[in-house]
Amino acid sequence: MEKTLGLEIIEVVEQAAIASARLMGKGLRNEADGVAVKAMRDRMNQIYMRGRIVIGEGERDDAPMLYIGEQVGICTQPNAAQMCSIDELLEIDIAVDPCEGTNLVAEGRQGSMAVLAISEKGGLLGAPDLYMKKLAAPPQAKGKVHIDYPATKNLQIIAECLDRAIEDLVVIVMKRDRHKDLISEIRSTGARVRFIDDGDISAALSAGINGTGVHALMGIGAAPEGVISAAALRCLGSHFQGQLIYDPDVVQTGLLKGTKAEIEEQLKAQGVEQPDKVWEAEELASGKNVLFAACGITDGDFIKGVRFFTGSARTETMVISSQSNTVRFVDTVHILDPAHHASLVI
């Protein structure tokens, strides 16, 4: 999978990032997402693959493109058997977030990326569009921290694993009312809190990569993004756990319809037999071969955003593979207008 699709998925996230970055700082949140979705889908449909969106822009009735269940790739066409090889006809699952952090792009702030993860069929959990409690931590803490532990205990463990004082730790938390108690607990240990308003895939990666200055992600965010984060951190050998949160009183957004009991019954009817299960990264992204790619739209902790020059653009992409146990950073210059070759900046 990596040999046949590795370069292709790089180009998929690059095209989405370039399209969205054109609208950076213009206050056009929905438009920045829309152009990224279209660019990502267009490039996917040029690839010799048989892909199925398992995490995307929503249900079919709510999303015109990259909706859950959509088939993408040349090898989904009726005459695919005549055009595609046996390997290309194998089904793959795809999880996408073409513009992770739409508000960040609209406001010209750091941390937005175009991301996707792929695996063989059944290799990525199709998480319901609910919330998820998440814990991400560096590789040294994998299997030692636990999402059920108090934040105090987890920070003590992380500090010991990294051989540093708790006061040296930085924890990313999404700035939401539901996290008031969590924030107070983190601060009581002496650790520092870094708030984000959006983009917790980027935050999970920052926690899972040594040297970013971030040592944990804690709190509740969107469940689909949790699966994509799990795919990346599983490939990195870092710690990630997630647990569905479906109690409206806990998430405090007003977006969940019905009571906790009603939503629990809906989940069970959809086949989620253990709604309160704690999911490990290896369960959320269980495939034998998992590939993750992220291209910066705006600058982040580990990759730069898109930079535009006369007739060209430069992107930075991170590609992580469970198959080859590699993390690659790809620096690409895109000639957007051949008439301006002389203006190329390296």
UniProtKB/Swiss-Prot annotation:
One of its GO terms (biological process) is reductive pentose-phosphate cycle. Its EC number is 3.1.3.11, 3.1.3.37. It catalyses: beta-D-fructose 1,6-bisphosphate + H2O = beta-D-fructose 6-phosphate + phosphate; D-sedoheptulose 1,7-bisphosphate + H2O = D-sedoheptulose 7-phosphate + phosphate. Its cofactor is Mn(2+). Keywords: Calvin cycle, Carbohydrate metabolism, Hydrolase, Manganese, Metal-binding. It is an enzyme of class 3 (hydrolase). It comes from the Bacteria. Pfam families: FBPase_glpX. The keyword Metal-binding applies. Coiled coil: none annotated. Mn(2+) 1 binds at D33, E57. Pathway: Carbohydrate biosynthesis; Calvin cycle. CDD domains: FBPase_glpX. Mn(2+) 2 binds at D97, E100, E225. Homotetramer. Catalyzes the hydrolysis of fructose 1,6-bisphosphate (Fru 1,6-P2) and sedoheptulose 1,7-bisphosphate (Sed 1,7-P2) to fructose 6-phosphate and sedoheptulose 7-phosphate, respectively. Belongs to the FBPase class 2 family. This is D-fructose 1,6-bisphosphatase class 2/sedoheptulose 1,7-bisphosphatase.
